[in-house]
């Protein structure tokens, strides 16, 4: 079968960003790469783009007329879905470059997020110097701040856009080069600073047989790992640090979504999990901690991160929440209970050591997980960062992944 020539897809709302889009197209063509320009404007006006807004909007489930309603908010949401579906139907997508303000960024990035990890994605945006998590999510989108507004060409915007063109062209070429693959299957592992010793022991034990992909449990970290599991790219998961659940349930800043553990249930991938850092909720700097939490047990992890110790009642709630999701998993599941503590701070003499709070967490898991031959809780009578715990996790993983 003849190989399909890959192209860079350049997306912009041509009614407001057409001048910048055409400038980028010329730069990319001069660089020798094939470009497909796509108009994602919601105004319905004509444009010189190779793919018209009408063609993109036709991919919306309710049709183009449901996109061009004249109501900006709903039109952006509809066109975003239409562009995602349009892009998913193209077999020659070698990279995607987007430009936009707040609306354009919200419109283009969902389609980028839906593409596989490794396909270059660059968004030049006025929003790129703020909180970009809603745009990037668990994907590998690169965000470039536009400095000036994307509202015409000037000496600053020309330079920034030229850099963006060079960056995406370079990534496009690099993505077509083979990457050395030693044949080891990949496993996903979750880690936090306070579970680092555990994960270091685990990766050292697995390294010879597996390509260990370690994900920082920052909310998007867990989502990234589960995205790979959903894509069939992981041979197994060692979800040793499930702390994102604390933030989701109790208002922290590093929260997972309600779909945490969903990819494990959908994929059936061999899964070893544990309670890593379920003793803490993450906030920003100390002065950002919500007023209702100011009298709680707080620990300044660093100037930008403040940790709040979970209570026995909160632990019982999150134990039940995790159990309910583990019960949906029909693949091989082993969830380890580190009876000596769940983080570096949850150890004798440390700030968060609380045997009663931990006991509430463990008991909730025992009370609510429906154990079967394939779904088991495993009691480990040591601290999570003890080498013996790591050994137990590795042994359980080997047992279920044969």
Swiss-Prot record:
Transmembrane segments: none annotated. HAMAP family: UPF0261. CDD domains: Tm-1-like. NCBIfam families: PRK02399.1-1 (NF002673), PRK02399.1-2 (NF002674). PANTHER family: UPF0261 DOMAIN PROTEIN (AFU_ORTHOLOGUE AFUA_1G10120). This is UPF0261 protein BPP1817. Belongs to the UPF0261 family. InterPro entries: Tobamovirus_resist_UPF0261, UPF0261, UPF0261_C, UPF0261_N.
């Amino acid at each position: 079968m003849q190989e399909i020539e890959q192209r860079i897809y350049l997306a912009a709302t041509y009614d407001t960003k057409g001048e910048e889009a055409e400038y980028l197209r010329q730069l990319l063509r001069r660089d020798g790469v094939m470009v497909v320009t796509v108009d994602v404007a919601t105004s319905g006006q004509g444009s010189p783009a190779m793919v018209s807004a009408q063609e993109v909007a036709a991919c919306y489930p309710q049709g183009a007329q449901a996109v061009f309603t004249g109501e900006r908010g709903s039109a952006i949401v509809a066109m975003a879905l239409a562009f995602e579906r349009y892009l998913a139907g193209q077999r020659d997508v070698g990279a995607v470059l987007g430009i936009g303000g707040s609306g354009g960024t919200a419109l283009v990035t969902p389609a980028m997020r839906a593409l596989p990890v490794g396909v270059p994605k660059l968004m030049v945006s006025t929003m790129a110097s703020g909180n970009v998590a809603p745009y990037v999510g668990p994907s590998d989108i690169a965000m470039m701040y536009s400095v000036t507004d994307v509202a015409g060409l000037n000496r600053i915007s020309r330079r920034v856009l030229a850099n963006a063109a060079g960056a995406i062209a370079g990534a496009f070429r690099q993505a077509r080069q083979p990457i050395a693959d030693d044949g080891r299957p990949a496993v996903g592992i979750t880690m936090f600073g306070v579970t680092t010793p555990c994960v270091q022991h685990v990766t050292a034990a697995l390294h010879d047989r597996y390509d260990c992909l370690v994900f920082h449990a920052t909310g998007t970290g867990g989502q990234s790992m589960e995205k790979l599991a959903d894509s069939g790219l992981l041979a197994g998961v060692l979800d040793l640090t499930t702390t994102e659940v604390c933030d989701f349930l109790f208002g922290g800043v590093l929260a997972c979504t309600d779909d945490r553990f969903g990819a494990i249930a959908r994929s059936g991938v061999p899964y070893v999990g544990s309670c890593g850092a379920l003793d803490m909720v993450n906030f920003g700097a100390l002065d950002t901690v919500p007023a209702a939490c100011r009298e709680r047990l707080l620990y300044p992890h660093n100037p930008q991160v403040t940790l709040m110790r979970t209570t026995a009642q909160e632990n019982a709630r999150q134990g039940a929440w995790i159990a309910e999701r583990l019960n949906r998993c029909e693949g091989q599941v082993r969830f380890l209970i580190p009876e000596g503590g769940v983080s570096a701070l949850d150890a004798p003499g440390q700030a968060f050591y609380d045997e009663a709070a931990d006991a509430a967490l463990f008991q909730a898991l025992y009370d609510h997980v429906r154990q079967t031959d394939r779904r088991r809780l495993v009691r480990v009578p040591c601290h999570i960062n003890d080498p013996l715990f790591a050994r137990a996790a590795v042994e359980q993983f080997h047992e279920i992944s044969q």
